[in-house]
């Protein structure tokens, strides 16, 4: 679990739920550590302010390489907002300076000069993501989330649908597969415990 000055935003309820279902949280710093911790079975890149530390993140080439190699080997991973930004090829800050990031997502993330997304949303998960091999359910599975960012991506993902609860306005978002879930929304795990169980099951299979 990334935790330092650049990656510091996590809902406490989310961490409690991970631990409740048996996860052991191992902390590391994409800013200060040389590589990922040994013998981990999953990766959590939370929100924060990578744009304020983009130069230091770029300079830590060994960590960027460590994360890219781990995800290329299908280490189960969750990345939200700042963590999602870090996975891009590049990040361009508000001064227009472009920095190299982890290079996992072949896309650019850049400051837009205005608030891109703000507020609560419900994220509809891909059919069967958390229950592989089951019959189609009548109601799509959803998890509550929140977005607040001035940056945008040239590849926001199209595997989920985010919907505003009041207006009903919706848009595609998030890169999701059997081993990763990356996007701008900050998910609230207690709204869908099945999602947490799904991720932890993936980490167990990676042992």
Per-range role (PLM):
Residues 1, 26-27, 44, 79, ...:
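Structured core elements
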Residues 6-59, 65-70:
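Phosphate-binding active sites in nucleotide-utilizing proteins
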Residues 1, 15, 111-207:
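Amide-donor transfer/coupling interface in amidating biosynthetic enzymes
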Residues 11, 36, 95-98, 192-193:
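Alpha-helix N-cap/helix-start motif
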């Amino acid at each position: 679990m990334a935790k330092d000055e650049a990656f510091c935003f996590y809902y406490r309820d989310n961490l409690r739920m991970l631990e409740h279902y048996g996860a052991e949280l191992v902390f590391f710093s994409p800013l200060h550590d040389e590589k990922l911790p040994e013998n981990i079975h999953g990766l959590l890149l939370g929100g924060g302010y990578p744009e304020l530390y983009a130069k230091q993140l770029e300079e830590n080439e060994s960590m960027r390489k460590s994360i890219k190699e781990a995800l290329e080997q299908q280490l189960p991973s969750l990345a939200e907002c700042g963590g999602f930004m870090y996975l891009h090829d590049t990040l361009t800050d508000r001064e227009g300076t472009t920095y190299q990031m982890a290079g996992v997502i072949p896309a650019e993330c850049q400051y837009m000069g205005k608030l891109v997304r703000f507020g609560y949303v419900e994220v509809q998960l891909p059919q069967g993501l958390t229950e592989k091999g089951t019959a189609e359910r009548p109601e799509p599975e959803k998890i509550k989330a929140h977005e607040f960012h001035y940056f945008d991506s040239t590849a926001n993902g199209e595997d989920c649908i985010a919907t505003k609860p009041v207006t009903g306005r919706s848009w595609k978002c998030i890169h999701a597969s059997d081993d990763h879930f990356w996007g701008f929304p900050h998910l609230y795990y207690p709204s869908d415990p099945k999602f947490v169980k799904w991720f932890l099951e993936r980490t167990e299979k990676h042992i």
